[in-house]
Amino acid sequence: MSIVTKSIVNADAEARYLSPGELDRIKSFVAGGQQRLRIAQALTDNRERLVKQAGDQLFQKRPDVVSPGGNAYGQEMTATCLRDLDYYLRLVTYGIVAGDVTPIEEIGVIGVREMYKSLGTPIEAVGEGVRALKNAASTLLSAEDAAEAGSYFDYVVGALQ
């Protein structure tokens, strides 16, 4: 839930107008909107490159994943792994635009650990892949934008553990 929605829900629950502090937080949120949209656009525009870089980094760091018997062994399973990385990148962009982790949580990470466990997918490798996405994104973004985006990647990694 965005800061705007949270503030309105809280004020309405107390049958009051928004407080000066709530209005200041909303003002800051709105002022940061251009940055959040710029970051999301850059990640979206470069998603194929970012996913490929992250996959390459993951497979170099975790060759067991793409070796015979690994969860990403073979062309089809490697494509599935890259599809999952693309999915997490998309979730990160949702969180960035919202300025909140709620979309990430509600759309994508609830129950994901259990799903990967049931599939025999090494969850730590998925987390490593998301960290690789964060690294790839940081080379594309300014330091300030990378710091803003980084917290959303970190949230996904934390949710996977």
UniProtKB/Swiss-Prot annotation:
Residue positions, PTM N4-methylasparagine: N71
GO cellular component, one term: plasma membrane-derived thylakoid membrane
Pfam family, one: Phycobilisome
Broad class of the protein's primary localization: membrane
Localization of this protein: Cellular thylakoid membrane
Source organism superkingdom: Bacteria
UniProt protein name: Allophycocyanin subunit alpha 1
Keyword Membrane on entry: yes
Keywords attached to this entry: Antenna complex, Bile pigment, Chromophore, Electron transport, Membrane, Methylation, Photosynthesis, Phycobilisome, Thylakoid, Transport
Name of the gene this protein is made from: apcA1
Physiological role: Light-harvesting photosynthetic bile pigment-protein from the phycobiliprotein complex. Allophycocyanin has a maximum absorption at approximately 650 to 653 nanometers.
Membrane topology value: Peripheral membrane protein
Description of how the protein assembles with itself and partners: Heterohexamer of two alpha chains, one alpha-B chain and three beta chains.
CDD domains for the chain: APC_alpha (cd12125)
Family label: Belongs to the phycobiliprotein family.
Any GO BP annotation: photosynthesis
Post-translational modification: Contains one covalently linked phycocyanobilin chromophore. The chromophore is added by phycocyanobilin lyase CpcS 1.
InterPro entries per record: Globin-like_sf, Phycobilisome_asu/bsu, Phycobilisome_asu/bsu_sf
Positions of (2R,3E)-phycocyanobilin binding: C81
Naturally occurring in which organism (per UniProt): Nostoc sp. (strain PCC 7120 / SAG 25.82 / UTEX 2576)
